[in-house]
Amino acid sequence: MAEVEFVADEHGGVTVMRDGHPQSHVDVDDPEHLVFEYVQHMAAVLDAVHPAPDPIGVTHVGGAGLTLPRWVHATRPGSPQIVLEPDETLTAAVREQLPLPRCHRIRVRSQL
């Protein structure tokens, strides 16, 4: 079973660690603050092909800390999103430690 750890930083964000490896960075107070470069690139692509604030349907393959779904919710409220995340332990820990915002349309599905 994977070990999940949450490491807080001095700015209020949290890095989600799985088996000692950083998986994602979440700032629940500022979901538009993206730390990992690959997430910044994905956000830039979404901005280029579907500018905010209009909602967009998104399917995410992998979720970890749900950083990108949180960003989509913050920048395009009402967007229906499905996250395919096989690690149910990770998902449960993230939901407990880093709750999703109210009125979100993010659905996480376990895909084995």
List each model region and its residues:
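N-terminal auxiliary segments of SAM/dcSAM-dependent transferases
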Residues: 1-20
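The AdoMet/dcAdoMet-binding core of the Class I SAM-like
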Residues: 10-11, 29-112
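Catalytic zinc-binding patch centered on the HExxH motif and its immediate surroundings
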Residues: 23-27
